Amino acid sequence: VLERRYQIKNLLFAVYPDRKPLNYQPIMCGIVAYVGHRQAHEVIIKGLKRLEYRGYDSTGIALLNGGLNVYKKKGKVSELERFIKDQKLDSHIGMGHTRWATHGEPNDENAHPHYSATKKLAIIHNGIIENYSSLKQELLRKGHTFLSETDTEVFVHFIEDIQQNEQCSIDEAVRLALTKVVGAYAIVVMSLNDPDLLIAARKGSPLVLGVGRGEFFM
């Protein structure tokens, strides 16, 4: 059941009751997202560096800058910085992630963010989707292919599958997907077709919303 839902201009934020699964263990992934007037990648990289103390094995960012572009690497934030230094990063909306491996070994493919099948959606996720295997089998039967071993990639494919089947908005597709997944999570979703919108939700995993003057942070 949705406990609280906020729409603040171009940010949709949902909070679900913190009823944790019996075998729940906190996962120490880091999430940073930004929309506003500053260069998003600078804000996100700075935020990820402040989360390094939590421990992680890979890192990545997604930016909307002419397309929905994902940059990710195994290793430290400093390695990601070197990887993106020659990229065109001009964007005022984006999200970043530091990963602590659960499903799938530490490598570039398993790092977040993850694309949907059409690459029109991207997601970052902290937590564990306990029923991801059954969801994945359902999607495989529909012809989906996956590049990683993660539950997170299954999650974003599932969201897009719902959006296509129901012909609904991205925020409604996320809401419907969250009624089907089992586990604890904090997520942020971006959509190529909604270039000024960040969608976030949490259940059991922490996620903090910051509101500035004409800008928003997670």
Where are these regions (language model features)?
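Leucine-biased recognition of intrinsically disordered, low-complexity hydrophobic segments
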Residues: 2, 11-12, 22
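Proteins with a high burden of low-complexity, intrinsically disordered sequence enriched in S/T/G/P/A and R
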Residues: 3-4, 8, 26-28
